[in-house]
Amino acid sequence: MANEHSPLLVHGVYSMMGNAEDSRGGSAGTGEASNPKTDPRKLNTFFGVMVPTILSMFSIVLFLRTGFVVGHAGLLHGLLMLFVAYFIISLTILSICAISTNGAVEGGGAYFMISRSLGPEFGGSIGLMFYLAKVCACGVYVLGLVEAIMDVFGQDPGSSVAQGLRVLPQGYWYTVLYSSVVLLLCMLVCLVGAHIYAKASFLILLVVTVSLISIIISPLIVSPQGFNITHTYGNNHSVTVSPSYTGFNSTTLKNNLGPRYSLDYSTNTMMSFATVFAVMFTSCTGIMAGANMSGELKNPSESIPKGTIMAVAYTFTVYVLLYLLLSSTCDRSLLLNDYAVFQRVNVWPPFVTIGVYCASLSAAMCSMIGASRILHALALDQLFGLPLAPAAVTSSSGNPWVSVLYTWALVQCTLFAGQLNVIAGIVTVFYLLAYAAVDLACLALEWASAPNFRPTFQFFSWHTCLLGIISCVVMMFVINPVYSSASIVLLLLLLLFLHYRSPTSSWGYISQALIFHQVRKYLLMLDSRKDHVKFWRPQVLLMVSNPRSSCQLICFVNQLKKGGLFVLGHVQIGDLDVLPADPVQPQYNFWLSLVDKLGVKAFVDLTLSPSVRQGTQHLLRITGLGGMKPNTLVLGFYDNSYPEDYFLQDPVFCKGDRSEGDNFGVDLPSLQAHFPPVRHAESPRALQPQEYVSIIQDAIKMGKNICLARYFFQLPPESKGATYMWGKDSMDTIDVWPTNLLTPGSASYADVGSLFLLQMACVLNMASGWRRARLRIFVCVESESEDQGWLAKEEQFRELLGKLRIRAAIKIVAWDNVARMVRGPNTESQPVSEDFLCAVNGLLKEHSSTAAVRFLYLPDPPSSCELSQQYLTQLDTLTRDLGPTLLIHGVTPVTCTEL
């Protein structure tokens, strides 16, 4: 006996019956038995693609709106509409064939294709829009069926007494009542199971085919005749017309060539090209039936393109033939005033009646089934959270009965429109939007040039995809600008909602492939030989030992990069030769999650090395790509203090919402547990003074600027969710001391190191978090030059700042007493005294104790490794208890005074 996994053969819901849970890791139902696994039916091209596609495109519009289209649009406009519609769907068919032959399409149909191609945000939003299109289409078919029933069994508009078979009273509320009863029947059948349609589909196709044959041969048998047709409008105002059926007649054909848009007798609204096209296009919305069957076909790469194209060509031929028959045999009045014109002029009217009932009822039921399967797929993917969570529940046989109930309720709302023509425009707009999304998915895959995008169907290009997108969007606005604008606004709102929820998935993100493609292209264009000092910007490599003690520094350097490269580097001590696996690769997700938590724009580069020095050398050489490589190395300061654990201070880490979803497999507890505790008194140091100073020397030898950062743990939190950001207060200052304080009088304020220091301070002052801070530059002078010397020094420096376009307050600092403490030139063999260093430190405290951050000149490191400890001791004394301080040594020109 067939179960819920029996392949459907009608209306685009075929593979939706498959075991969707298998592809998503299990059902989301509560306690329901899992679906029994059965081998998929192996279908050929005819039964697997042609039959479902033909049935999907031969809906109620074929029988009840073909005359409406020809009557209002005329033969020429009608054929133009047909060509435009089939041109649009043909472009989309090419995209469908390409995507579907690049992998099996599972439950969800178009939603599955779009979501797995474009990612969860776009896929989820378009999937919901496509679901709404299916809901509205179901309403169209139900209203069309009721309309067909009323044509046979409805009382005459001018009579209140039943006559023969015409026993059903007519009116708006009666239409809603009858539609609700039909919809209830559809819902009950859908709750029982969808396998009924898998058995009946070929029989339905035979019935529809017999009806079509009777329509085509009727002009050869039925003789010309006249009719009296009465329509009742508001206030029981009745109008009777007397159209005629002429048989094949050249005069009739000539009269029906041009358009004659007039009032629609069912809605009493004026028709136009757009409104008629909207009704006609609903007959072209079943083209995805074959693509949805890819998992059930013997040879999907051959059957989907061949079957879909053959089915579309067949339906196009039938529609053209019917347009020609109606234009040649029925006068305009008959076409405008009777939707059931095929039944009125048929050799045996019940042929058409049976065809209408079979086509519309099966279409309505299968649209409901298709919509419920899309909703079920959305619920299983958990994109919209709790509102759709119940829709994931299934019966023991796998029938998503809750999704059916959801869909029934929404379709019931559409039935209050009361007329097929009223909601046909909405259906068309939603379907066009879905088709545009399919074309966009194929275009994105083609542009991304991913090696794994190798569809066996090759008759497409980015030109066809782009043309399909443009055609769909243009026709949307031609049909109804209001509906189109509203649908796009709804789509954007759904996109923003899903982007805000940031759902993670294993489907892959097409955006990443497109970004990679574009970044690669532009990186190749970024030629380091064309670098110019005018366009210099910081490209920073920040070495991080343990993020627990470095988060404030990471956030600070993020402000310092000025749109340049920012890389967090970390060296894992070890030797790959003696390790069973690389310990670095599993760490990347934790570091990237840390970057997300801090809200910084940084890359992460980790390496395995026997020593920190060798690892830093590796990173300085290989970090970056092309013209984007670090030009500045930032290190934490080397001293004997014990670091503080930032994770215990910032609410983002210590009070984070542990119920929030993980970030690509890394939740907050995992992130906290991954990084080791900070160093304490008993912990051995992985880095010795000689190695630390050697790293500074290596960076200078490699032409990298160097910055040493001290006391940045004193800065308040600046990560996402923090309530305070430093530099926001206009009273905060950035203090710059652009001279080598260890060699008084021997350094110029215009050397490379001083200018680099000024540039970095200016860059920080330009950052959004520090824009309101005041920049102060301290110029140290000796009073021996008297007042005129002081003024000359200040004027000279002010002129330099003017050329560099740096806005800053210049502070003149007399340091005669400090300078006298230097016994001679500061050399490696004769360093400055401890008293001098303490005096300079006191001078800095006196003038910069309230600064938010200080920029100091970093002296050259000693060439001898024996003097490394002495060098670090000097720096320690110089910056002791100052607060956040950056010691900077520049080796590259970074300023320009010319245009």
Swiss-Prot record:
Instruction: Give the Cytoplasmic compartment stretches of this protein.
Output: 1-42, 100-125, 197-201, 291-306, 372-373, 421, 511-563, 771-899
Q: Which Gene3D superfamilies match?
A: Amino acid/polyamine transporter I (1.20.1740.10)
Q: Name one GO molecular function term.
A: potassium:chloride symporter activity
Record localization: Cell membrane; Lysosome membrane
List membrane-spanning regions.
Answer: 43-63, 79-99, 126-146, 176-196, 202-222, 270-290, 307-327, 351-371, 374-394, 400-420, 422-442, 456-476, 488-510, 564-584, 750-770
Predominantly, its location class is: membrane
Q: GO cellular-component terms in the record?
A: lysosomal membrane; plasma membrane
Q: Which residues lie on this side of the membrane: Extracellular?
A: 64-78, 147-175, 223-269, 328-350, 395-399, 443-455, 477-487, 585-749
Report the record's Gene Ontology biological process terms.
Answer: cell volume homeostasis; chloride ion homeostasis; chloride transmembrane transport; potassium ion homeostasis
Q: Which residues are glycosylated?
A: N228, N236, N249
Q: Which residues form a coiled coil?
A: none
Span of the secretion signal?
none
Q: Which Pfam families match?
A: AA_permease, SLC12
Q: How does it sit in the membrane?
A: Multi-pass membrane protein
Q: Could you tell me the keywords of this UniProt record? A: Cell membrane, Glycoprotein, Lysosome, Membrane, Transmembrane, Transmembrane helix, Transport
Q: What does this protein do?
A: Seems to correspond to a subunit of a multimeric transport system and thus, additional subunits may be required for its function. May play a role in lysosomal ion flux and osmoregulation.
Family membership, please give it. Belongs to the SLC12A transporter family.
| Name this polypeptide is given | Solute carrier family 12 member 9
Q: Which organism is it from?
A: Danio rerio (Zebrafish)
Gene name of the record: slc12a9
